[in-house]
């Protein structure tokens, strides 16, 4: 069975931890306020973060539909790529824009050269 002092210690632990965190926070704020350069740096970094997020949001507004059209998973009732406004070269356009299953990884101009393709055994 637990000693009575162990129970008292566990009850006082959250108050002690919160007091230490409060002291640490007030010391940090006091140091922060005396350093004008830190405040300026913080404001600049915060401004940069906000502008970056706004830029990402703006870019997604312009190009989001294009990206979604290029990287979507095909549905059970597939439509031709031209119907989605995506024009792919012949032989490309599997799931997520990769090469279809069973195709080679060579581009069409290398295959059209009428060269015998080497396998990994050669």
UniProtKB/Swiss-Prot annotation:
UniProt topological domain (Cytoplasmic) ranges: 30-43
Sugar-modified residues: 96
Extracellular compartment spans: 2-8, 65-122
Protein name: T-cell leukemia translocation-altered gene protein homolog
Keyword Kinase: no
Highest taxon above the source species: Eukaryota
Transmembrane portions of the chain: 9-29, 44-64
Family listed: Belongs to the TCTA family.
The species this protein was found in: Mus musculus
Job description of the protein: May be required for cellular fusion during osteoclastogenesis.
Family annotation (InterPro entries): TCTA (IPR016560)
Keywords of this entry: Acetylation, Glycoprotein, Membrane, Transmembrane, Transmembrane helix
Region (Disordered): 82-103
Membrane topology type: Multi-pass membrane protein
Any one cellular-component term (Gene Ontology): membrane
Taxon lineage: Eukaryota, Metazoa, Chordata, Craniata, Vertebrata
Keyword Glycoprotein on entry: yes
Pfam families (UniProt xref): T_cell_tran_alt
Localization in the cell: Membrane
Modified residues (N-acetylalanine): 2
